[in-house]
Amino acid sequence: MTTFLGNPVTFTGKQLQVGDIAKDFLLIATDLSQKSLKDFEGKKKVISVVPSIDTGICSKQTRTFNEELSELDNTVVITVSMDLPFAQKRWCSAEGLDNVILLSDFYDHSFGQEYALLMNEWHLLTRAVLILDEHNKVTYTEYVDNVNSDVDYEAAINAAKILP
């Protein structure tokens, strides 16, 4: 059971499992352009999912994965939240991070629904990490049980680094 602020939450959709092929998504970038998995075709993808970039844990998660993994060959680190693209852009500017890929699911929540990440009670995304290979095959997942806690950074970073 997943909890947020001590209360149980429910999700729509089916959580991704290792071995699944991730379905395409359509998210909004900080420049208001639309982005899909096709935009990152042929690259390994670390998808860091957070409820809101403006919280301490979410900020830490975004910064940690970008600092630890953005230099990996043929790899992109993508952070997805429900924040408006304007707030995401403001956060990047305030944090001095220019190369962070922040995408928003605010428009229709389809990413959260398809990947079983949308907390129905809050209309926010849960905390998770999804790692996909160049062919969008899922190689690692972590959906946290307590949204107010950190992901297992060490496990996720190691999983990303061992991808061939």
Swiss-Prot record:
Disulfide bridge positions per record: C58-C92
Catalytic machinery residues: C58
Domain Thioredoxin as annotated: residue spans: 16-162
Entry superkingdom: Bacteria
GO MF term list: thioredoxin peroxidase activity
Reaction it catalyzes: a hydroperoxide + [thioredoxin]-dithiol = an alcohol + [thioredoxin]-disulfide + H2O
EC top class named in words: oxidoreductase
Extra remark beyond the main annotation: The active site is a conserved redox-active cysteine residue, the peroxidatic cysteine (C(P)), which makes the nucleophilic attack on the peroxide substrate. The peroxide oxidizes the C(P)-SH to cysteine sulfenic acid (C(P)-SOH), which then reacts with another cysteine residue, the resolving cysteine (C(R)), to form a disulfide bridge. The disulfide is subsequently reduced by an appropriate electron donor to complete the catalytic cycle. In this atypical 2-Cys peroxiredoxin, C(R) is present in the same subunit to form an intramolecular disulfide.
Assembly with partners or alone: Homodimer.
Protein's UniProt name: Thiol peroxidase
